[in-house]
Curated annotation (Swiss-Prot):
PANTHER family the UniProt entry points to: NAC TRANSCRIPTION FACTOR 47 (PTHR31719:SF201), NAC TRANSCRIPTION FACTOR 56 (PTHR31719)
GO cellular component entries: nucleus
Protein name stated in the entry: NAC transcription factor 47
The keyword Membrane is annotated on this UniProt entry: no
Origin species: Arabidopsis thaliana
UniProt keyword annotation of Repeat present: no
BP GO terms, sorted: embryo development ending in seed dormancy; positive regulation of ethylene biosynthetic process; response to flooding
Location of region: Disordered: 147-166, 200-226
Length: 359
Protein backbone atom coordinates (compact mmCIF):
# COMPACT_ATOMS: atom_id res chain seq x y z
CA UNK A 1 0.00 0.00 0.00
CA UNK A 2 1.02 3.59 -0.52
CA UNK A 3 2.24 5.02 2.77
CA UNK A 4 2.58 8.58 1.56
CA UNK A 5 -0.06 10.74 0.03
CA UNK A 6 1.16 11.41 -3.52
CA UNK A 7 -0.87 14.59 -3.75
CA UNK A 8 1.50 16.29 -1.32
CA UNK A 9 4.31 16.17 -3.89
CA UNK A 10 2.22 17.19 -6.90
CA UNK A 11 2.27 20.76 -8.19
CA UNK A 12 -0.93 22.80 -8.08
CA UNK A 13 -3.26 22.22 -11.00
CA UNK A 14 -1.98 18.73 -11.68
CA UNK A 15 -4.45 16.42 -13.39
CA UNK A 16 -3.93 12.77 -14.17
CA UNK A 17 -5.40 12.05 -17.62
CA UNK A 18 -3.11 9.50 -19.26
CA UNK A 19 -3.78 7.99 -22.67
CA UNK A 20 -4.24 4.28 -23.27
CA UNK A 21 -0.73 3.96 -24.65
CA UNK A 22 0.77 5.75 -21.63
CA UNK A 23 -1.09 3.52 -19.20
CA UNK A 24 0.27 0.40 -20.90
CA UNK A 25 3.88 1.44 -21.48
CA UNK A 26 4.66 3.60 -18.46
CA UNK A 27 2.51 2.09 -15.74
CA UNK A 28 1.16 -1.40 -16.38
CA UNK A 29 4.25 -2.84 -18.05
CA UNK A 30 6.48 -1.56 -15.27
CA UNK A 31 4.12 -2.88 -12.63
CA UNK A 32 4.12 -6.36 -14.15
CA UNK A 33 7.91 -6.38 -14.51
CA UNK A 34 8.33 -5.04 -10.94
CA UNK A 35 10.00 -1.88 -12.21
CA UNK A 36 9.46 1.47 -10.46
CA UNK A 37 6.60 3.54 -11.89
CA UNK A 38 7.05 7.28 -12.57
CA UNK A 39 4.67 8.30 -9.80
CA UNK A 40 3.00 6.35 -7.03
CA UNK A 41 -0.42 7.57 -7.98
CA UNK A 42 -2.11 4.23 -8.70
CA UNK A 43 -2.95 2.04 -5.70
CA UNK A 44 -2.97 -1.75 -5.51
CA UNK A 45 -6.59 -2.71 -4.78
CA UNK A 46 -8.52 -5.88 -5.48
CA UNK A 47 -11.53 -4.22 -7.06
CA UNK A 48 -13.55 -7.46 -7.07
CA UNK A 49 -13.79 -7.41 -3.29
CA UNK A 50 -15.56 -4.04 -3.20
CA UNK A 51 -18.49 -2.32 -4.83
CA UNK A 52 -17.58 0.34 -7.37
CA UNK A 53 -19.06 3.19 -5.32
CA UNK A 54 -16.69 2.27 -2.48
CA UNK A 55 -13.57 2.36 -4.65
CA UNK A 56 -13.08 6.16 -4.93
CA UNK A 57 -12.34 6.31 -1.20
CA UNK A 58 -9.52 3.79 -1.71
CA UNK A 59 -7.87 5.69 -4.54
CA UNK A 60 -5.01 8.08 -3.60
CA UNK A 61 -5.85 10.41 -6.44
CA UNK A 62 -8.76 11.11 -8.73
CA UNK A 63 -11.79 13.35 -9.15
CA UNK A 64 -14.13 11.82 -11.72
CA UNK A 65 -12.16 8.68 -12.55
CA UNK A 66 -9.96 6.45 -10.45
CA UNK A 67 -7.10 4.08 -11.35
CA UNK A 68 -6.13 0.81 -9.67
CA UNK A 69 -3.74 -2.08 -10.12
CA UNK A 70 -5.78 -5.20 -9.47
CA UNK A 71 -5.14 -8.95 -9.65
CA UNK A 72 -7.56 -11.33 -11.35
CA UNK A 73 -8.78 -14.63 -9.99
CA UNK A 74 -9.83 -17.61 -12.05
CA UNK A 75 -13.50 -18.41 -12.22
CA UNK A 76 -12.68 -22.12 -12.30
CA UNK A 77 -9.47 -23.76 -10.96
CA UNK A 78 -8.37 -25.08 -14.34
CA UNK A 79 -10.21 -22.55 -16.49
CA UNK A 80 -9.04 -19.51 -18.38
CA UNK A 81 -11.98 -17.25 -17.61
CA UNK A 82 -11.60 -14.55 -14.94
CA UNK A 83 -13.95 -14.27 -12.02
CA UNK A 84 -16.04 -11.09 -12.43
CA UNK A 85 -18.09 -11.41 -9.23
CA UNK A 86 -17.90 -8.46 -6.84
CA UNK A 87 -19.29 -7.64 -3.39
CA UNK A 88 -22.97 -7.05 -4.21
CA UNK A 89 -22.99 -7.72 -7.93
CA UNK A 90 -20.78 -8.53 -10.87
CA UNK A 91 -18.94 -6.92 -13.75
CA UNK A 92 -20.15 -7.78 -17.23
CA UNK A 93 -18.13 -7.24 -20.39
CA UNK A 94 -19.71 -5.08 -23.08
CA UNK A 95 -18.64 -4.41 -26.64
CA UNK A 96 -15.48 -5.80 -28.20
CA UNK A 97 -11.90 -5.64 -27.02
CA UNK A 98 -9.80 -2.78 -28.35
CA UNK A 99 -6.22 -3.35 -29.42
CA UNK A 100 -3.72 -0.74 -28.30
CA UNK A 101 -0.83 -0.34 -30.74
CA UNK A 102 2.13 2.00 -31.11
CA UNK A 103 4.52 2.52 -34.03
CA UNK A 104 7.72 0.49 -33.72
CA UNK A 105 9.97 2.75 -35.81
CA UNK A 106 9.93 0.48 -38.87
CA UNK A 107 6.70 1.75 -40.34
CA UNK A 108 4.60 -0.86 -38.55
CA UNK A 109 2.45 -0.83 -35.43
CA UNK A 110 3.13 -3.14 -32.53
CA UNK A 111 0.29 -4.33 -30.32
CA UNK A 112 1.12 -3.57 -26.71
CA UNK A 113 -2.14 -4.12 -24.88
CA UNK A 114 -5.84 -4.84 -24.85
CA UNK A 115 -8.63 -2.66 -23.49
CA UNK A 116 -11.89 -4.21 -22.31
CA UNK A 117 -15.03 -2.32 -21.21
CA UNK A 118 -17.23 -3.67 -18.41
CA UNK A 119 -20.45 -2.53 -16.70
CA UNK A 120 -21.37 -3.23 -13.09
CA UNK A 121 -24.66 -5.01 -12.34
CA UNK A 122 -26.30 -5.32 -8.94
CA UNK A 123 -27.50 -8.75 -7.90
CA UNK A 124 -26.73 -12.08 -9.47
CA UNK A 125 -26.70 -13.01 -13.14
CA UNK A 126 -28.74 -13.14 -15.23
CA UNK A 127 -31.22 -10.94 -13.33
CA UNK A 128 -28.82 -8.21 -12.36
CA UNK A 129 -29.76 -4.54 -12.50
CA UNK A 130 -27.50 -2.40 -14.64
CA UNK A 131 -25.78 0.58 -13.02
CA UNK A 132 -23.86 3.60 -14.28
CA UNK A 133 -20.49 2.34 -13.10
CA UNK A 134 -18.04 1.59 -15.91
CA UNK A 135 -14.62 -0.05 -15.85
CA UNK A 136 -11.89 -0.08 -18.48
CA UNK A 137 -9.57 -3.00 -17.93
CA UNK A 138 -6.09 -2.84 -19.47
CA UNK A 139 -3.88 -5.87 -19.83
CA UNK A 140 -0.57 -6.43 -21.58
CA UNK A 141 -0.32 -8.05 -24.98
CA UNK A 142 1.42 -11.40 -25.30
CA UNK A 143 4.55 -9.77 -26.68
CA UNK A 144 5.08 -7.79 -23.47
CA UNK A 145 4.46 -10.67 -21.10
CA UNK A 146 7.42 -11.24 -18.76
CA UNK A 147 6.96 -15.00 -19.15
CA UNK A 148 7.23 -14.77 -22.91
CA UNK A 149 10.25 -12.46 -22.67
CA UNK A 150 12.05 -14.79 -20.25
CA UNK A 151 11.21 -17.78 -22.44
CA UNK A 152 12.64 -16.04 -25.47
CA UNK A 153 15.83 -15.06 -23.64
CA UNK A 154 16.36 -18.61 -22.35
CA UNK A 155 16.51 -20.04 -25.87
CA UNK A 156 12.85 -20.55 -26.56
CA UNK A 157 11.17 -19.90 -29.87
CA UNK A 158 10.90 -16.34 -31.07
CA UNK A 159 7.66 -14.68 -30.12
CA UNK A 160 5.55 -12.88 -32.72
CA UNK A 161 4.50 -9.46 -31.57
CA UNK A 162 1.14 -9.78 -33.28
CA UNK A 163 -1.74 -9.96 -30.84
CA UNK A 164 -3.42 -12.65 -32.91
CA UNK A 165 -0.69 -15.21 -32.11
CA UNK A 166 -2.03 -17.20 -29.17
CA UNK A 167 -0.49 -20.58 -28.50
CA UNK A 168 -1.58 -20.96 -24.92
CA UNK A 169 -4.51 -19.92 -22.76
CA UNK A 170 -2.07 -19.24 -19.95
CA UNK A 171 -0.34 -16.52 -21.91
CA UNK A 172 -3.50 -15.14 -23.52
CA UNK A 173 -5.27 -14.48 -20.21
CA UNK A 174 -2.43 -14.47 -17.68
CA UNK A 175 -4.82 -14.34 -14.77
CA UNK A 176 -1.94 -14.36 -12.31
CA UNK A 177 -0.62 -11.03 -13.66
CA UNK A 178 -1.72 -7.53 -12.79
CA UNK A 179 -4.25 -5.53 -14.74
CA UNK A 180 -4.82 -1.78 -14.67
CA UNK A 181 -8.41 -0.65 -14.10
CA UNK A 182 -9.99 2.75 -14.66
CA UNK A 183 -13.27 3.20 -12.78
CA UNK A 184 -15.75 6.01 -13.36
CA UNK A 185 -19.45 6.69 -13.13
CA UNK A 186 -21.32 7.53 -16.28
CA UNK A 187 -23.19 10.76 -15.64
CA UNK A 188 -25.74 10.79 -18.48
CA UNK A 189 -26.40 7.06 -18.71
CA UNK A 190 -29.76 5.42 -18.24
CA UNK A 191 -30.76 4.76 -14.65
CA UNK A 192 -31.60 1.39 -13.16
CA UNK A 193 -34.87 -0.21 -14.18
CA UNK A 194 -36.99 0.89 -11.15
CA UNK A 195 -35.72 4.46 -11.48
CA UNK A 196 -36.29 4.46 -15.23
CA UNK A 197 -39.89 3.34 -14.75
CA UNK A 198 -40.46 6.07 -12.16
CA UNK A 199 -38.93 8.83 -14.28
CA UNK A 200 -40.79 7.69 -17.38
CA UNK A 201 -44.08 7.64 -15.50
CA UNK A 202 -43.52 11.15 -14.16
CA UNK A 203 -42.64 12.47 -17.60
CA UNK A 204 -45.79 10.96 -19.08
CA UNK A 205 -47.94 12.59 -16.40
CA UNK A 206 -46.30 15.96 -17.02
CA UNK A 207 -46.82 15.66 -20.77
CA UNK A 208 -50.46 14.72 -20.30
CA UNK A 209 -51.01 17.72 -18.00
CA UNK A 210 -49.49 20.10 -20.54
CA UNK A 211 -51.49 18.81 -23.49
CA UNK A 212 -54.71 20.76 -24.25
CA UNK A 213 -57.89 18.86 -23.50
CA UNK A 214 -60.00 18.16 -26.57
CA UNK A 215 -63.60 17.12 -26.06
CA UNK A 216 -64.58 14.29 -28.37
CA UNK A 217 -68.15 15.52 -28.29
CA UNK A 218 -67.20 18.48 -30.45
CA UNK A 219 -66.65 16.08 -33.33
CA UNK A 220 -69.55 13.70 -32.73
CA UNK A 221 -72.44 16.04 -33.67
CA UNK A 222 -70.94 16.64 -37.08
CA UNK A 223 -70.60 12.93 -37.68
CA UNK A 224 -74.12 12.22 -36.49
CA UNK A 225 -75.58 14.93 -38.68
CA UNK A 226 -73.73 13.65 -41.71
CA UNK A 227 -74.99 10.10 -41.37
CA UNK A 228 -78.67 10.81 -42.33
CA UNK A 229 -77.50 12.74 -45.36
CA UNK A 230 -75.39 9.82 -46.52
CA UNK A 231 -78.26 7.45 -45.97
CA UNK A 232 -80.62 9.63 -48.00
CA UNK A 233 -78.21 9.76 -50.89
CA UNK A 234 -77.55 6.03 -50.89
CA UNK A 235 -81.15 4.80 -50.26
CA UNK A 236 -82.75 5.66 -53.57
CA UNK A 237 -85.35 2.96 -54.35
CA UNK A 238 -87.60 2.13 -57.29
CA UNK A 239 -90.53 3.77 -55.51
CA UNK A 240 -88.64 7.06 -55.63
CA UNK A 241 -88.32 6.63 -59.37
CA UNK A 242 -92.08 6.19 -59.68
CA UNK A 243 -92.65 9.32 -57.61
CA UNK A 244 -90.59 11.26 -60.11
CA UNK A 245 -92.36 9.72 -63.13
CA UNK A 246 -95.79 10.39 -64.53
CA UNK A 247 -97.66 7.10 -63.99
CA UNK A 248 -100.11 7.88 -66.78
CA UNK A 249 -97.22 8.32 -69.17
CA UNK A 250 -95.69 5.03 -68.00
CA UNK A 251 -98.94 3.12 -68.63
CA UNK A 252 -99.30 4.63 -72.08
CA UNK A 253 -95.69 3.88 -72.80
CA UNK A 254 -96.12 0.20 -71.95
CA UNK A 255 -99.30 -0.16 -74.04
CA UNK A 256 -97.98 1.61 -77.12
CA UNK A 257 -96.31 -0.31 -79.92
CA UNK A 258 -92.64 0.29 -80.62
CA UNK A 259 -93.43 1.66 -84.05
CA UNK A 260 -95.36 4.61 -82.60
CA UNK A 261 -92.76 5.34 -79.97
CA UNK A 262 -90.27 8.07 -80.84
CA UNK A 263 -86.89 8.93 -79.48
CA UNK A 264 -88.36 11.93 -77.71
CA UNK A 265 -90.42 9.57 -75.54
CA UNK A 266 -87.31 7.79 -74.37
CA UNK A 267 -85.50 10.99 -73.70
CA UNK A 268 -88.50 12.35 -71.80
CA UNK A 269 -88.71 9.30 -69.56
CA UNK A 270 -84.98 9.09 -68.94
CA UNK A 271 -84.88 12.83 -68.37
CA UNK A 272 -87.42 12.54 -65.57
CA UNK A 273 -85.40 9.74 -63.95
CA UNK A 274 -82.22 11.77 -63.98
CA UNK A 275 -83.76 15.02 -62.79
CA UNK A 276 -81.06 16.70 -60.69
CA UNK A 277 -83.65 18.61 -58.67
CA UNK A 278 -85.02 15.32 -57.32
CA UNK A 279 -81.96 13.12 -56.86
CA UNK A 280 -79.04 15.51 -57.17
CA UNK A 281 -75.63 14.95 -58.74
CA UNK A 282 -77.30 13.02 -61.57
CA UNK A 283 -77.71 9.92 -59.45
CA UNK A 284 -79.27 7.81 -62.19
CA UNK A 285 -76.67 8.93 -64.72
CA UNK A 286 -74.12 7.21 -62.48
CA UNK A 287 -76.15 4.14 -61.50
CA UNK A 288 -78.02 3.25 -64.72
CA UNK A 289 -76.18 2.41 -67.94
CA UNK A 290 -76.40 4.97 -70.71
CA UNK A 291 -79.00 4.09 -73.29
CA UNK A 292 -79.11 4.81 -76.99
CA UNK A 293 -81.91 4.66 -79.50
CA UNK A 294 -81.67 2.18 -82.37
CA UNK A 295 -79.57 3.30 -85.29
CA UNK A 296 -81.10 4.37 -88.53
CA UNK A 297 -79.52 1.40 -90.26
CA UNK A 298 -81.71 -1.10 -88.33
CA UNK A 299 -84.50 -2.07 -90.73
CA UNK A 300 -86.25 -5.02 -92.34
CA UNK A 301 -88.29 -7.91 -91.09
CA UNK A 302 -85.82 -8.92 -88.43
CA UNK A 303 -85.96 -5.51 -86.75
CA UNK A 304 -89.76 -5.41 -86.89
CA UNK A 305 -89.95 -8.88 -85.36
CA UNK A 306 -87.68 -7.78 -82.53
CA UNK A 307 -89.87 -4.74 -81.91
CA UNK A 308 -93.01 -6.91 -81.82
CA UNK A 309 -91.32 -9.26 -79.35
CA UNK A 310 -90.32 -6.30 -77.25
CA UNK A 311 -93.88 -4.98 -77.27
CA UNK A 312 -95.31 -8.36 -76.35
CA UNK A 313 -92.82 -8.85 -73.51
CA UNK A 314 -93.49 -5.37 -72.21
CA UNK A 315 -97.28 -5.76 -72.37
CA UNK A 316 -97.19 -9.19 -70.71
CA UNK A 317 -94.99 -7.89 -67.94
CA UNK A 318 -97.24 -4.89 -67.44
CA UNK A 319 -100.33 -7.09 -67.31
CA UNK A 320 -98.73 -9.33 -64.70
CA UNK A 321 -97.86 -6.30 -62.67
CA UNK A 322 -101.38 -4.88 -63.09
CA UNK A 323 -102.94 -8.18 -61.95
CA UNK A 324 -100.74 -8.36 -58.88
CA UNK A 325 -100.87 -4.74 -57.86
CA UNK A 326 -104.02 -2.70 -58.51
CA UNK A 327 -103.98 0.93 -59.48
CA UNK A 328 -107.03 1.41 -57.28
CA UNK A 329 -104.75 1.41 -54.26
CA UNK A 330 -103.05 4.52 -53.05
CA UNK A 331 -99.68 5.70 -54.31
CA UNK A 332 -98.09 4.68 -51.01
CA UNK A 333 -99.30 1.10 -51.36
CA UNK A 334 -97.95 0.92 -54.87
CA UNK A 335 -94.61 2.26 -53.68
CA UNK A 336 -94.47 -0.43 -51.01
CA UNK A 337 -95.30 -3.21 -53.46
CA UNK A 338 -92.91 -2.03 -56.13
CA UNK A 339 -90.08 -2.01 -53.59
CA UNK A 340 -90.32 -5.81 -53.57
CA UNK A 341 -89.13 -5.78 -57.20
CA UNK A 342 -86.73 -2.83 -57.42
CA UNK A 343 -84.99 -4.08 -60.51
CA UNK A 344 -88.09 -4.75 -62.67
CA UNK A 345 -87.71 -1.84 -65.04
CA UNK A 346 -83.95 -2.32 -65.20
CA UNK A 347 -84.37 -5.99 -66.18
CA UNK A 348 -86.87 -5.14 -68.93
CA UNK A 349 -84.63 -2.45 -70.32
CA UNK A 350 -81.55 -4.69 -70.29
CA UNK A 351 -83.32 -7.74 -71.79
CA UNK A 352 -84.67 -5.77 -74.69
CA UNK A 353 -82.63 -5.56 -77.86
CA UNK A 354 -84.39 -2.32 -78.69
CA UNK A 355 -82.33 -0.50 -76.02
CA UNK A 356 -78.61 -1.14 -76.04
CA UNK A 357 -75.66 -0.24 -73.84
CA UNK A 358 -73.25 2.35 -74.97
CA UNK A 359 -69.59 1.85 -74.32
Amino acid sequence: MISKDPRSSLPPGFRFHPTDEELILHYLRKKVSSSPVPLSIIADVDIYKSDPWDLPAKAPFGEKEWYFFSPRDRKYPNGARPNRAAASGYWKATGTDKLIAVPNGEGFHENIGIKKALVFYRGKPPKGVKTNWIMHEYRLADSLSPKRINSSRSGGSEVNNNFGDRNSKEYSMRLDDWVLCRIYKKSHASLSSPDVALVTSNQEHEENDNEPFVDRGTFLPNLQNDQPLKRQKSSCSFSNLLDATDLTFLANFLNETPENRSESDFSFMIGNFSNPDIYGNHYLDQKLPQLSSPTSETSGIGSKRERVDFAEETINASKKMMNTYSYNNSIDQMDHSMMQQPSFLNQELMMSSHLQYQG
